[in-house]
């Protein structure tokens, strides 16, 4: 199979549409199709912080329903879902922007988009694995030994990365650089941690190039292992990007 795997969108709908066009997709029959039969995939964190989270929800949920795209949830998706089903969550760290968009809708529109997202989230796997391609699409990564497993420990890693339980001064969790020691045969394509440019190491590819923080929105063309990016229209927030050795 041939994929165009897109990093964390975070409500950057305009950049997403520009990227889809640059990748060669055409609007047909209510969805976006590629003339070569390629399929889009999303590594999660569709919403929060950016200006048009609900438009991203509408687009991705429609494409997944039409079976023209794959989606896996990220930690922001998980939090938004818990908010939508009435769980007590803190409306901050970006969620407040999506909630503001929801509150600006009519009741009918709000009910509709909540139903769309809940269906998208509830029907999504924790991660997608494609054995014939030796490919896993996940939000924050996965250990090779955990491919095929879906317990709570695996869920925590997939949504948040290899967290230590400690926190950084800005309140974010301290995460180990799991990719640096990965030795598996599977390609692991993920996002979650904003980097200045796509990071390939040991068959792992981080494609979160921090669009919502003024970086870029990036797609990995698989199996070619080529990158296609669109510059962000958002202001640059340099401190949000992580630098790795080498």
Curated annotation (Swiss-Prot):
Q: Does the keyword rRNA processing apply?
A: no
* SUPFAM superfamilies, alphabetized: Metallo-dependent phosphatases (SSF56300)
* Cofactor(s) needed: Ni(2+)
Mention any one GO cellular component term assigned to this protein in its UniProt record: cytoplasm
EC number(s)? Answer: 3.6.1.17
The record's section on Pfam families has: Metallophos (PF00149)
* Cross-referenced NCBIfam families: PRK13625.1 (NF010148)
Name listed for the protein in its UniProt record: Bis(5'-nucleosyl)-tetraphosphatase PrpE [asymmetrical]
What species is this protein from? Halalkalibacterium halodurans (strain ATCC BAA-125 / DSM 18197 / FERM 7344 / JCM 9153 / C-125) (Bacillus halodurans)
> What lineage is on file?
Bacteria, Bacillati, Bacillota, Bacilli, Bacillales
Protein encoded by which gene: prpE
């Amino acid at each position: 199979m041939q994929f165009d795997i897109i990093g964390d969108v975070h409500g950057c709908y305009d950049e997403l549409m520009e990227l889809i066009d640059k990748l060669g997709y055409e609007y047909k029959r209510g969805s976006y199709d590629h003339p070569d039969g390629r399929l889009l995939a999303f590594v999660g964190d569709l919403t929060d912080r950016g200006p048009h989270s609900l438009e991203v929800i509408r687009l991705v949920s429609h494409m997944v329903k039409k079976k023209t795209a794959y989606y896996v949830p990220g930690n922001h998706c998980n939090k938004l879902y818990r908010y939508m089903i009435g769980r007590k969550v803190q409306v901050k760290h970006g969620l407040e922007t999506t909630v503001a968009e929801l509150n600006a809708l009519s009741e009918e529109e709000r009910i509709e988009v909540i139903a769309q997202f809940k269906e998208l989230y509830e029907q999504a796997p924790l991660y997608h694995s494609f054995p014939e391609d030796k490919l896993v699409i996940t939000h924050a990564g996965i250990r090779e030994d955990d491919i095929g497993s879906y317990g709570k420990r695996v869920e925590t890693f997939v949504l948040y990365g290899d967290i230590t339980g400690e926190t950084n001064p800005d309140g974010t969790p301290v995460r180990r650089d799991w990719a640096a020691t990965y030795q598996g045969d599977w390609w692991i394509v993920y996002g979650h941690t904003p980097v200045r440019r796509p990071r390939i190491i040991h068959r792992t590819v981080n494609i979160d190039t921090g669009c919502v923080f003024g970086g870029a929105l990036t797609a990995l063309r698989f199996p070619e292992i080529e990158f296609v990016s669109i510059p962000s229209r958002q202001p640059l927030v340099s401190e949000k990007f992580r630098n790795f050795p080498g």
